[in-house]
Design a protein with these regions (language model features):
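C-terminal transmembrane helical hairpin of 12-TM major facilitator-type secondary transporters
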Residues: 283-330
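Cytoplasmic helix-loop-helix junction between adjacent transmembrane helices
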Residues: 112-149
């Protein structure tokens, strides 16, 4: 179902490559949007008359907005079409960007941040199904490019900020990009939603063959959803607080602190392609364990020995081993565990990730003050959550190898 105002009836369908391009541009800007507040934290503290706690509250509202709308967005996408869903996501992102500049306190900024969370929900619910439907022969690769486009934008943004400095130039430019995209999407015929793909014969056969050793919903299902939270928590908290950690704890310059996110994003971009290849040859649980242990170890090293070199190496490690596709590996395991309920379990897994974007910054507001020690404590929390994830991972891996679930 399409709203009549959005699309002309006799309009020819757009090429699928054009639709994919629209999706990637949308995520390119959204990827930059989610780190804007942390990248301009000092400037926003003056504009909104607040401190680091206030900045954390604004950041946390992204997660709350995502939590509130994530289930609604999925229903809306199936009911009213991928195009209309993406349009709502794009408009929400524009509202966020404009709102950042006109806000004069953290409460106005927090309301605007809710719209970015809404953009997250509607972009995901419209874009991922669209790519899966338009590219049925290679959905995983096309969806991986979403992460790649976000990583690319997060690589470029800190460099642009270092060169331009002014939020009054960068943020309106991002809004204009989305505005132009919105115009193109509004007059493009996306075609009808694809039908739900039925289980293949091989999937049905696999279910029958492993019927005596099925994963437990209460143990394996819940455990994987917990990993959906912990895996997201590690890289999200790092991406939000690494720049200010570098300034307050290490004593680095603002320019250096912002480049940490560039290293993180470049590494993440590289990892997207390498991890997608590795996971075809190595058991996914082995990939999860190795990646998570390396990420947790580097975080711990940075907490114990915070230096510019260690911070840069940690950015590279977190980008590659925590943000470059490991979350998607967990989702793949969960989908293979419960092939008859892929949609539902994906929703639970995504909801756990959305919880990260709210819980992490909110908890940080109770830890942060104006001292460097409080920032160290935030990263100690990140390490603790990483260790918790590894413990859950080991339990699930032992069960997987013992009962040969996959």
């Amino acid at each position: 179902m399409e709203f009549p105002i959005m699309c002309k009836k006799n309009q020819p369908k757009a090429k699928r490559s054009v639709l994919a391009f629209y999706v990637y541009i949308n995520y390119f800007v959204w990827g930059s949007s989610i780190i804007l507040v942390s990248q301009f934290h000092s400037w926003f503290m003056e504009l909104w008359h607040t401190d680091l706690k206030g900045i954390s509250i604004v950041i946390s509202m992204l997660g709350l907005g995502h939590l509130i709308t994530v289930l609604l967005a999925g229903w809306f996408s199936d009911k009213f079409g991928r195009k209309n869903t993406i349009i709502i996501g794009t408009i929400s992102n524009i509202i966020f960007l404009i709102g950042l500049l006109i806000s004069r306190n953290i409460w106005m900024a927090s309301i605007c941040s809710l719209f970015l969370g809404n953009a997250n929900s509607f972009n995901d619910s419209g874009s991922y199904p669209l790519l899966t439907e338009k590219f049925p022969e290679k959905p995983a690769s096309m969806n991986a490019l979403v992460k790649a486009s976000m990583s690319l934008s997060q690589t470029i943004l800190p460099l642009v900020i270092a060169a331009v400095h002014s939020a009054y130039i960068i943020i309106p430019a991002m809004a204009v990009m989305l505005g132009l995209l919105l115009l193109k999407v509004s007059v493009t015929n996306f075609g009808k939603n694809g039908s739900i793909v039925k289980e293949t014969v091989s999937e049905q056969k696999e279910i029958l063959e492993t019927s005596t050793n099925k994963p437990s919903v209460l143990i394996d299902g819940v455990g994987m959803v917990i990993l959906g939270f912990t895996l997201s928590f590690i890289f999200y908290m790092y991406s939000q607080y690494a720049p200010v950690f570098a300034e307050k704890v290490i004593g680095s310059t603002p320019v250096f602190s912002k480049t940490l996110i560039s290293w993180y994003a470049i590494s993440s971009l590289i990892s997207v392609f390498i991890t997608s290849t590795v996971v075809r040859k190595v058991h996914p649980f082995k990939v999860l364990l190795v990646y998570s242990i390396v990420a947790a170890a580097m975080l711990a090293v940075m907490v114990v020995h915070p230096t510019p070199t260690i911070a840069r190496l940690t950015s590279i490690a977190i980008g590659f081993f925590a943000a470059g596709g490991i979350w998607q590996v967990g989702l793949t395991i969960l989908s293979r565990y419960f092939p008859r309920e892929k949609g539902r379990v994906t929703g639970y897994y995504s909801f756990a990730a959305a919880l990260t974007y709210f819980v992490g910054p909110i908890v940080s507001t109770f830890i942060l003050d104006d001292t460097a020690a409080s920032l160290v404590h935030v990263f100690v929390l990140d390490v603790a959550v990483s260790v918790l994830g590894i413990i859950v991972m080991i339990i699930l891996a032992v069960r997987c190898f013992k009962y040969k679930f996959i």
